[in-house]
UniProtKB/Swiss-Prot annotation:
The gene is Cftr. Epithelial ion channel that plays an important role in the regulation of epithelial ion and water transport and fluid homeostasis. Mediates the transport of chloride ions across the cell membrane. Possesses an intrinsic ATPase activity and utilizes ATP to gate its channel; the passive flow of anions through the channel is gated by cycles of ATP binding and hydrolysis by the ATP-binding domains. The ion channel is also permeable to HCO(3)(-); selectivity depends on the extracellular chloride concentration. One of its GO terms (biological process) is positive regulation of cyclic nucleotide-gated ion channel activity. This is Cystic fibrosis transmembrane conductance regulator. The lineage of its organism: Eukaryota, Metazoa, Chordata, Craniata, Vertebrata. It is an enzyme of class 5 (isomerase). A lipid is attached at residues 524, 1391 (S-palmitoyl cysteine). Monomer; does not require oligomerization for channel activity. May form oligomers in the membrane. Interacts with SLC26A3, SLC26A6 and NHERF1. Interacts with SHANK2. Interacts with MYO6. Interacts (via C-terminus) with GOPC (via PDZ domain); this promotes CFTR internalization and thereby decreases channel activity. Interacts with SLC4A7 through NHERF1. Found in a complex with MYO5B and RAB11A. Interacts with ANO1. Interacts with SLC26A8. Interacts with AHCYL1; the interaction increases CFTR activity. Interacts with CSE1L. It comes from the Eukaryota. It is found in: Apical cell membrane; Early endosome membrane; Cell membrane; Recycling endosome membrane. The modification Phosphoserine is found at residues 549, 660, 670, 684, 698, 710, 732, 763, 785, 790, 808, 1440, 1452. It comes from Mus musculus (Mouse).
Length: 1476
């Protein structure tokens, strides 16, 4: 990016914004790239602004008990803000003086006033000079205020982000993503938009006082009649605004519901397609959309009436101001036209500028208070290490995630006077509800010496991760002592990849040591994966490492932790996504050998890991079940495997015991129904209130399996006898106050969000503990749309020592300067929809022909306009054929100081009424406005329906190219624009064009010479608009692209916050965030500057036009006093309205870009058409292109498939048409009812094969089910043959019944039967409403095991004969998995089952195994054959596992085999040399 020329520009260049001309010229001639944009001036850089505001905020905190952020902002920006305010006031004052000169010019036409006539030309020059002065004052002032607003936003963005990195985990768990979105994306944008109007809080009253003084001098008491009408109008607008807010509040809930379900579908589009739910989901969303549009229309009508009332008031304000005066004194044309000009300015000040300024200040103070509260929140405390400690010591440590109970617990504590409950279970009692919470860790004692390895194990929610958080300082111990000896390194259970290269992710800002780096890469088995990339370890990884498999991400995260030279390594389940082949290699070479001399704490559930650990800690419900060595464990706790690890002794349990385990062990949340009347059948319940809104999907829910969260009834609670109304709160993805206002035309990102990651309410900690897709790299590419891109805001810093945070404890490599804007853009891989710089005519044509009634409405608008023009021409005809004889019909009355012209009947007065009424009719336009707005909203409904259908039926290869956030933006921001902004903007543009054309006709009829001046002005306006639009729209697009990395970086930082803190890399990420801010600032600053360039030149053209009109009028009108007044008044009206019309056309073009983006999605090729095209290209018998179902029995859905036999012939799978084959020429067959296990390294293509079975990818070859080929069956019929359990469990917001049977195909009896069969009945019965109980937020009240059972139930209900299971045991503790394993055996006894798993024990029920390696079938045989000497499968099973699982089977034949790896086998001596 080039340096900004503003810093070296001359005063004249700055005044006229000429320094932007090169970028405008380049944008008109060529396509603008990021490198073409100038850097933001140094005064606008995020580093400078952040440090400036941070310094003042720290000073404010240090000096006062109650620090105020407004004071820190005042010290930073006040004086420049005041200076530009004074300039703005001087520019506005000229508007009040212009009518005075206009009245003097009109008065000069009095035949007896020869003095005034002689100076008329000088009065005209003075009037023109006022316009010039106003232009020179107004535009620099507006630009300066916009720039200050941009600087304030940038500074607070940075401050909030820094604070986010320092907040305690307890505070983060209370902050929702929606709150952050509202705090930043919606609220802070108001500085950009509103600061230019903030000064009217004092300018408007001064201006009204001045105008009323001048009107009093002109009309005396009559002037207050018009002011009274304006005040009434303001009250009327306030009433309409209140009604509009009511409709918007009702609409907000429906928009939220629609966007939540839409985001859930986008996030789980793979599952929706696999279940064949496209039609059901489409119908569900369209029903919500229909209700939403009813509220949208009502709100639009209110806005329409408000806007119309503003224009409609123009005539009546003038009429009421003049009428009392004319009744007493007669008609005085000079005063009439002067009053018109005064009232135009007065109306704008009273009805628009002052109310808007009041609203801006009100919103700004409220927003600043929110940010201030945020900046004062509690920060996390780093656990200081003790150099005297040899390893790590814990003594009687107990810890609570107290804030995890949400604000309901907080409210209870406050209402009880913060009294501590002495009960062991910390019960908090209500009148009919109970919230029960236990400590997440209780009385933990351990002592690890330096160099030892501690293995921590236990069931889900036992407190394993919480223990690591204690050591990191993320969780504060409520009692006990914790000591450790030195620096800590951390590997999270949830792999986190930052935007950057593979090498940067591993080094993570630490000094580069080549030998250490290569040793770590080798030990983590990354060499083979790195060699597959063209750029090797310099390959740039995008958002969340989307190009990597789950196993690759996990190993990079592990390598990052190992590369750091630390004294203590915390490894939280680092092998969860690794296949059995890789896991054993990484554990041996990395954890056991490379890190042999380091202190390690490993969270694991593998028996082999426990055997090799120096000490073992088994946690159960937060308590220490066992602490000691493995030999001690075997002697003291022989039952631990069956009780906590859940191995095959589960099979020995009785049926009743298994049912108990199902309903008790899996349950994270329990319902205390001791007093709640849940037995009432028709009582409506939802997860609402404080618990429902504050604690959904929190990390704490995963930590504490014994903590009970009550389902809050939708009725008032009584706490200590006081009623507390719990209102149902919803996170709206668009602003509460104005659903459409979030969708600013200059931004392509939804101002909400997001994240819309399929959760209606999600705490920040959920981001850190969200389970990403764990499939192979290939599957991940096909499911790019599943990843989340919550558009979340940033948070700020609150620390007394400003500079201490910048110090790093490790030796770091300063790579700040190596990060340029291009790299930053590449890292975030923003989704950019390529559309032309200016909206094409084809887009307008498609839009206006979308609805048959829209063309009729437009024709009606033109007819109404022609009637109005005809009326104006008729009045002109009367005027010319009935000239006023001022000598016979008029009287001349002389005042003491003024000569007044009075006309008797005055056709001029009639004509003046026409001028007012004509403008009013054109502005109000009820008969054409309401139908137009109504029809345009209907067009928005059609576009939404078509786009939804297109996305749901789009191929996965197409969706993989789009971001989830980008798709959701179309359904949120762009649809909001189509609903709220576009209808009224198009209406405004049409009526403004009609006003201009009508006024030109009138003026040209009165004075034809003016028409000659108007035509060149119109041509220049149109050409200048086209010239500006080419660059402006490109700058907006670049600005929008620059906005995405800001929020993406924040989300990325939040997901890896624990890792960032553990590595002390906050400063590095602050620098990266500032780079993103500067990139956005550069684009937005250029757009503001070029906009001022355009607006100033529009004003300059207007000044030239008015000069020409004024002098033509003065020199050619002669004695026509009324004609001169009409011409000058309408000339001012023409050009001001034409300016408005040009700006409105630019707004229309900007908003129509949303229509263009929607059309891009609508035009996406559907899956069915894509496969039809593929089938047509296949060699077929005969020449017919028509698909023919050869197997007649397929048409009968109850017959096919009957057995579940599969035959795969020469199957080749690609993700893209032009991509490499992931699987190549695969052939095999599966017998009916057979169970087949898929084996292979991470990324070998196991999940890809399952996707190919479902026809999710580009496939060639043939797949047959019971003799029926895939190319002879429709896509929906083919997928219905399969029952699917995907890696990512999909629970959408809806009832149990809807989640199990969204098509409404089955009766309750059948659903209950299946629920009982899979073990889900006892779970559903515990919820109020049972099958009608509404699940929200991804079913947060269910454990992961329950959700898997829901998927099993869906497959059973589908009556499918072939079941595809993609890692169903991922993130399940052993007991939970044994329950699901038992259900699988019983529910799908007669079905063909294809299972992809990483757990060896999970595969033991399979009769045959398909081993995939290097894109081909390596082996396909039975278990016995795979355990033979020549099998590669046996290397993944240790000798102890063979003895355990396969006693008597081939145990004597075991010999070590060559590993499938590109790494060379290390000798023990080599390992010793490379230990850390």
């Amino acid at each position: 990016m080039q340096k900004s020329p503003l810093e070296k520009a001359s005063f004249i260049s700055k005044l006229f914004f000429s320094w932007t001309t090169p970028i405008l010229r380049k944008g008109y001639r060529h396509h603008l790239e990021l490198s073409d944009i100038y850097q933001a001036p140094s005064a606008d850089s995020a580093d400078h602004l952040s440090e400036k505001l941070e310094r003042e905020w720290d000073r404010e905190q240090a000096s006062k008990k109650n620090p105020q952020l407004i004071h820190a902002l005042r010290r930073c920006f006040f004086w420049r803000f005041l200076f530009y305010g004074i300039l703005l006031y001087l520019g506005e004052v000229t508007k009040a003086v212009q009518p005075v000169l206009l009245g003097r010019i009109i008065a000069s036409y009095d035949p007896e006033n020869k003095v005034e006539r002689s100076i008329a030309i000088y009065l005209g020059i003075g009037l023109c000079l006022l316009f010039i002065v106003r232009t020179l004052l107004l535009h620099p002032a507006i630009f300066g205020l916009h720039r200050i607003g941009m600087q304030m936003r940038t500074a607070m963005f940075s401050l909030i982000y820094k604070k986010t990195l320092k907040l305690s985990s307890r505070v983060l768990d209370k902050i929702s993503i929606g709150q952050l979105v509202s705090l930043l994306s919606n609220n802070l944008n108001k500085f950009d938009e509103g600061l230019a109007l903030a000064h009217f809080i004092w300018i408007a009253p001064l201006q009204v006082t001045l105008l009323m003084g001048l009107l009093w001098d002109l009309l005396q008491f009559s002037a207050f009649c018009g002011l009274g009408l304006l005040i009434i109008l303001v009250i009327f607008q306030a009433i309409l605004g209140k009604m509009m807010v009511k409709y918007r509040d009702q609409r907000a809930a429906k928009i939220n519901e629609r966007l939540v379900i839409t985001s859930e579908i986008i996030d789980n589009i793979y599952s929706v397609k696999a279940y064949c739910w496209e039609s059901a989901m489409e119908k569900m969303i369209e029903n919500l959309r229909e209700v939403e549009l009813k509220m949208t229309r009502k709100a639009a009508y209110m806005r329409f009436f408000t806007s119309s009332a503003f224009f409609f008031s123009g005539f009546f304000v003038v009429f009421l101001s003049v009428l009392p005066y004319t009744v007493i004194n007669g008609i005085v044309l000079r005063k009439i036209f002067t009053t018109i000009s005064f009232c135009i300015v007065l109306r704008m000040s009273v009805t628009r500028q002052f109310p808007t300024a009041v609203q801006i200040w009100y919103d700004s103070f409220g927003m600043i208070r929110k940010i201030q509260d945020f900046l004062q929140k509690q920060e996390y405390k780093v656990l200081e290490y003790n150099l005297m400690t040899t390893g790590i010591i814990m003594e009687n440590v107990t810890a609570f995630w107290e804030e995890g109970f949400g604000e309901l617990l907080e409210k209870v504590q406050q209402s009880n006077g913060d009294r501590k409950h002495s009960s062991d279970e910390n019960n908090v009692s209500f009148s009919h509800l109970c919230l029960v919470g236990n400590p997440v860790l209780k009385n933990i004692n351990l002592n690890i010496e330096k160099g030892e390895m501690l293995a921590i194990t236990g069931s889900t929610g036992s407190g394993k991760t919480s223990l690591l958080m204690l050591i990191l300082g993320e969780l504060e111990a409520s009692e006990g002592i914790i000591k450790h000896s030195g620096r800590v390194s951390f590997c999270s259970q949830f792999s986190w990849i930052m935007p950057g290269t593979i090498k940067e992710n591993i080094i993570f800002g630490v000094s580069y040591d080549e030998y250490r780096y290569k040793s770590v890469v080798k030990a983590c088995q990354l060499q083979q994966d790195i060699t597959k990339f063209a750029e090797q370890d310099n390959t740039v990884l995008g958002e969340g490492g989307v190009t990597l498999s789950g196993g690759q991400r996990a190993r990079i995260s592990l390598a990052r932790a190992v590369y750091k030279d630390a004294d203590l390594y915390l490894l939280d389940s680092p092998f969860g996504y690794l296949d059995v082949f890789t896991e054993e290699q990484v554990f041996e070479s990395c954890v056991c050998k490379l890190m042999a001399n380091k202190t390690r704490i490993l969270v694991t559930s593998k028996m082999e890991h426990l055997r090799k650990a120096d000490k073992i800690l088994i946690l159960h419900q937060g308590s220490s079940y066992f602490y000691g060595t493995f030999s001690e464990l075997q002697s003291l706790r022989p039952d631990f495997s069956s009780k906590l690890m859940g191995y095959d002794t589960f099979d020995q349990f009785t049926e009743e015991r298994r049912s108990s385990i199902l309903t008790e062990t899996l349950r994270r949340f329990s319902v205390d129904d001791s007093s709640a009347p849940w037995s009432k059948p028709k009582q409506s319940f939802r997860q609402t209130g404080e618990v429902g809104e504050k604690r959904k999907n929190s990390i704490l829910n995963s930590f504490s399996s014994v903590r009970k969260i009550s389902i809050v009834q939708k009725t008032p609670l009584c706490i200590d006898g006081e009623s507390d109304d719990l209102q149902e709160k919803r996170l709206s993805l668009v602003p509460d106050s104005e659903q459409g206002e979030a969708a600013l035309p200059r931004s392509n990102m939804i101002a909400t969000g997001p994240t819309f990651p399929g959760r209606r309410r999600q705490s920040v900690l959920d981001l850190m503990t969200f389970t990403p897709n764990s499939g192979s790299s290939n599957l991940q590419r096909t499911r790019t749309s599943i990843r989340k891109i919550s558009l979340v805001p940033q948070i700020s810093l609150n620390e007394v020592d400003v500079y201490s945070r910048r110090l790093s404890q490790d030796s770091t490599l300063n790579i700040t300067e190596e990060i340029n804007e291009e790299d930053l853009k590449e890292c975030f891989l923003d989704d950019v929809i390529k559309i032309p710089p200016v909206t094409t005519w084809n887009t307008y044509l498609r839009y206006f022909t979308l609805h048959k009634g829209l063309l009729l409405v437009l024709i009606w608008c033109v007819l109404v306009f022609l009637v109005e023009v005809a009326a104006s021409l008729f009045v002109l005809w009367l005027l010319k054929n009935n000239p006023v004889n001022s000598g016979n019909n008029g009287t001349k009355i002389s005042n003491s100081s003024y000569v007044v012209i009075i006309t008797s009947t005055s056709f001029y007065y009639i004509f003046y009424i026409y001028v007012g009424v004509a403008d009013t009719l054109l502005a109000l336009s009820l008969f054409r406005g309401l139908p137009l707005v109504h029809t345009l909203i209907t067009a928005s409904k059609i576009l939404h329906r078509k786009m939804l259908h297109s996305i749901l039926h789009a191929p996965m290869s197409t969706i993989s190219k789009l971001k989830a956030g980008g798709i959701l933006n179309r359904f949120s921001k762009d649809i909001a624009i189509l609903d709220d902004f576009l209808p009224l903007t198009i209406f405004d543009f049409i009526q403004l064009v009609f006003i201009v054309i009508g006024a030109i006709i009138v003026v040209s009829a009165l004075q034809p010479y003016i028409f000659l001046a108007t035509v060149p002005g119109l041509v220049v306006f149109i050409l200048l608009r086209a010239y500006f639009l080419h660059t402006a729209q490109q700058l907006k697009q670049l600005e929008s692209e620059g906005r995405s990395p800001i929020f993406t970086h924040l989300v990325t930082s939040l997901k890896g916050l624990w890792t960032l803190r553990a590595f002390r890399r906050q400063t590095y990420f602050e620098t990266l965030f500032h780079k993103a801010l500067n990139l956005h600032t550069a684009n937005w600053f250029m757009y503001l500057a070029t906009l001022r360039w355009f607006q100033m030149r529009i004003d300059m053209i207007f000044v030239l036009f008015f000069i020409v009109v004024t002098f033509i009028s003065i020199l050619t009108t002669g004695e026509g006093e009324g004609t001169a007044g009409i011409i000058l008044t309408l000339a001012m009206n023409i050009m001001s309205t034409l300016q408005w019309a040009v700006n409105s056309s630019i707004d229309t073009d900007s908003l129509m870009r949303s229509v263009s983006r929607v059309f891009k999605f609508i035009d996406i090729q559907t899956e069915e058409s894509m496969y039809t095209q593929i089938i047509k290209e296949l060699p077929r018998e005969g020449s017919s292109d028509v698909l023919v179902i050869k197997n007649e029995h397929v048409k009968k859905s109850d017959i096919w498939p009957s057995g579940g036999e599969m035959v795969v012939k020469d199957l080749t799978v690609k993700y893209m048409d032009d991509g490499n084959a992931v699987l190549e020429n695969i052939s095999f067959s599966i017998s009916p009812g057979q169970r087949v296990g898929l084996l292979g390294r991470t990324g070998s293509g196991k999940s890809t094969l399952l996707s190919a079975f479902l026809r999710m990818l580009n496939i060639k070859g043939d797949i047959e089910i019971d003799g029926v080929s895939w190319n002879s069956v429709t896509l929906q019929e083919w997928r219905k043959a399969f029952g699917v359990i995907t890696q990512k469990v999909f629970i959408f917001s809806g009832t149990f019944r809807q989640n199990l049977d969204p098509n409404g195909k089955w009766k309750d009896e059948e659903i209950w039967k299946v629920a009982d069969e899979v073990g889900l009945k006892s779970v559903i019965e515990q919820f109020p409403g049972q099958l009608n109980f509404t699940l929200v937020d991804g079913g947060y009240v269910l454990s992961h095991g329950h959700k898997q059972l829901m998927c099993l139930a869906r497959s059973v209900l589908s009556k499918a004969k072939i079941i595809l299971l993609d890692e169903p045991s991922a993130h399940l503790d052993p007991i939970t998995y044994q329950v699901i394993r038992r259900v699988l055996k019983q529910a799908f006894a007669g079905c063909t089952v294809i299972l992809c798993e990483h757990r060896i024990e999970a595969m033991l029920d399979c009769q045959r195994f398909l081993v995939i390696e290097e894109s081909n079938v390596w082996q396909y045989d039975s278990l016995q054959a795979l355990l033979s000497e020549k099998s590669i499968f046996q290397q993944a099973i240790s000798s102890s596992e063979k003895m355990r699982f396969f006693q008597g089977r081939h145990s004597s034949k075991h010999k070590p085999r060559t590993q499938i790896t590109a790494l060379k086998e290390e000798t023990e001596e080599e390992v010793q040399e490379t230990r850390l």
